[in-house]
Curated annotation (Swiss-Prot):
Residues 192-354 form the TRUD domain. InterPro entries: PsdUridine_synth_cat_dom_sf (IPR020103), PsdUridine_synth_TruD (IPR001656), PsdUridine_synth_TruD_CS (IPR020119), PsdUridine_synth_TruD_insert (IPR011760), TruD_catalytic (IPR042214), TruD_insert_sf (IPR043165), TruD_pseudoU_synthase (IPR050170). GO terms for biological process: tRNA pseudouridine synthesis. It is an enzyme of class 5 (isomerase). Belongs to the pseudouridine synthase TruD family. The active site is at D92. Residues 1-24, 217-240 are annotated as: Disordered. Its EC number is 5.4.99.27. The gene is truD. Disulfide bonds: none annotated. This is tRNA pseudouridine synthase D.
């Protein structure tokens, strides 16, 4: 019998601010996204263009609109099908972002007018920074990383006791609140942070999880026979990708939270599946030996957890038992897991640890108080909010980005 999941349970589970951290965040409170330029995202896509071909690549800076909407505007301008517009990743609407788009334009017949959409609001802007011809379309997931420049305002430091916890020894002079923040930043630049999925994955108050439960309550669509072939074709999942991703992400976050609580998120367990840093390569190990410990300490490899689905055979031992136990103890997670399996979603692995590249920071004194500007790079598929959550106990989103 299926246990009824309470609406409050969904809201609570989707609240990423309540997820545990390995260290006490040194900032009690801060506000971000007060202005568009407080959250800057630059897509890092090293590429040598051929200078020829039928794909026009545009390097675009935008704000106030999401990536999918801009792709639609570009297709209308070029008078091409939306499927002929390519981009690598989705960028935040409430940010100043730069990313590449590709437009398949046969015979290089460009529109008569420059791209300058007129039906956009005062809060929306689009600027073409560069254009190149290339012989290939830009496919999803092509870029390797994103650079973030994030400004935190209205900063309130954590208690003096929390600052003391970051001292190296009791004999040292007590740290100032600002020094405690800088020590924390230095530490996470070396050790990384828990690789949680961010709140945007779950929608407002967890609505994407509610949509997933609604989807899983419906009959599973039957596969259709392919003409002249013995195989059966699965029903496309693109239309439900948001719900499926939210379900897998919530299960992953809960497993990672348990690993943070027991301290194994960056050390591994028996039967662990490891991810090779900077790649999609994984390998399993029955035990954690000296060599693996050394590689974990240097950040060469990372422990992983499951993105739930079928065929999850690689993990074993204590690591496997922990994953299944966490799901079994929660009616919400159980319903999500069963729904994913019934739709034949194949299990994948995701690193538990998120390395932070090129982390730097700068303090600025303003009339209304100090602000902290962070500059760092994260691999594709990770969330800047995971870095902010490790630093700030209560991160307040400005009313600008909630509009």
């Amino acid at each position: 019998m299926t246990v009824q999941v309470q609406d409050h349970d969904i809201t609570t589970a989707a609240d990423t601010a309540k997820l545990p951290q390995p260290m006490q965040p040194p900032l009690k409170q801060a506000t971000y996204k007060t202005h568009t330029t407080d959250f800057i995202v630059n897509e890092l896509l090293p590429l040598e263009f051929t200078g020829e071909g039928e794909h026009l690549w545009l390097h675009i800076q935008k704000s106030g609109m999401n990536t999918a909407y801009l792709a639609k505007l570009l297709s209308e301008w070029a008078e091409i099908p939306l499927r002929d517009v390519g981009f690598s990743g989705l960028k935040d609407r409430h940010a100043l972002t730069t990313q590449w788009f590709s437009l398949r334009i046969p015979k290089k017949q460009l529109p008569d007018s420059e791209f300058a959409p007129v039906d956009i609001s005062a809060n929306e802007s689009v600027t073409i920074l560069e254009q190149q011809w290339h012989n290939k379309k830009l496919n999803r997931g092509t870029h390797r990383a994103n650079q973030f420049i994030i400004t935190l305002r209205d900063i309130e430091f954590a208690s003096f006791e929390a600052s003391l916890s970051l001292q190296i020894s009791a004999s040292e002079q007590p740290m100032s609140a600002k020094q405690a923040v800088e020590q924390h930043l230095t530490t996470i630049s070396q050790s990384g942070v828990p690789n949680y999925f961010g709140p945007q994955r779950f929608g407002r108050s967890g609505n994407n999880i509610r949509e997933a439960l609604s989807l899983f309550a419906r009959p599973v669509p039957e596969s259709r026979p392919q003409p002249n072939k013995g195989k059966r074709k699965r029903v496309p999942r693109e239309q439900n990708s948001m719900e499926l991703s939210a379900a897998r992400s919530l299960i992953f976050n809960e497993i990672l939270a348990a690993r943070v609580r027991d301290g194994s998120w960056n050390t591994g367990l028996a039967g662990e599946v490891f991810n090779l840093d900077g790649s999609g390569s994984i390998f399993a190990s029955d035990e954690i030996d000296h060599t693996l410990r050394a590689r974990l300490e240097t950040g060469d490899i990372h422990p992983t957890a499951v993105l739930w689905g079928t065929s999850n055979e690689k993990v074993s031992g204590k690591a496997a038992a922990m994953e299944t136990d966490i799901v079994a103890q929660s009616p919400l997670l159980m319903q999500l897991a069963v729904g994913l399996e019934q739709r034949d979603i194949k299990a994948q692995r995701r690193a538990l640890r998120l390395p932070i590249e090129a982390l730097s920071w700068e303090w600025e004194d303003k009339e209304d108080g100090q602000i902290l500007v962070l500059n760092f790079t994260l691999t594709t598929g990770s969330f800047a909010t995971s870095v902010l959550a490790s630093l700030v106990q209560e991160l307040i989103t400005s009313s600008y980005s909630r509009s």
